[in-house]
Amino acid sequence: MKVRPYEKVSLIYDSLMEKVDYSSWAAYILKIAQLHSPKFGKSLELGAGSGKISEQIYKRFKYYLATDISFQMLKSIEDNGFHRLCCNMASLPFKTNFDFIFSAFDSVNYLLRQKDLAALFREVSKVLDDEGSFTFDVSLESNSIYLVRPQTIQGRKNGFWYERISFYKKLSRIHHNRFYISDGHSNNYREYHKQKIYKLETYFKLAESCGFKVSACYDCFTFNDIKSNSNRAQFVFKKIN
């Protein structure tokens, strides 16, 4: 049975991400906030997933809202100390402004069309304070080609057996993750995830057209400038006032 992205992957997500150093990632996000948006007022997280970063940083802000397009992922969050809302990052339902907006886990790569990426930037511009910052990370082609070669991963979590098959199609610049999940009885599920691996210059071009300037573009997890062979980029946008 084919299901929507993260409908069943949410049940095995922690197993898939068990090697991720959430503490270091959270500290990196906070350092970016300190450098570019030191007010630490109202924060909005886009694509919060299972809330592992949210749980570590929300207390640093006066108000914290974690959002995700997957209701199942938000349901898996155990910490109830912050607000949660299910919504599409390219169509934000807010009338209030935020001082710091961020997205992690290359969630932005799930926007498969440039018009959707532009929609995200325009939506963020509407709800970002004039002095605020928007930061997000993206996966680049080097990551898909060199680090995530065609591979199959299998495992068990919460009574489910799963298999993940990953591959990259260079011509379309689409990175594919296919999940096969079974409860060991008669229930078998298929989830197909796609991510668009945009060229780095695409983000710069769309930023300017949507009213942003690129305040920084780091080699992800560092504060060094991006390089041609970087695997991931960390952008910091500021509004053009």
Where are these regions (language model features)?
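Conserved class I S-adenosyl-L-methionine
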Residues: 1-47
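Class I SAM-dependent methyltransferase SAM/SAH-binding core
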Residues: 50-91
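A short acidic, Gly/Pro-enriched loop at the edge of an enzyme's catalytic core
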Residues: 90-100
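A short SAM/SAH-binding and catalytic strip from SAM-dependent methyltransferases
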Residues: 99-115
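A short glycine-rich, Lys/Arg-flanked "PGG" loop and its adjoining helix->strand segment in the class I
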Residues: 118-130
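SAM-dependent methyltransferase
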Residues: 135-206
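C-terminal lobe and adjacent flexible extensions of AdoMet/dcAdoMet transferase-like proteins
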Residues: 200-241
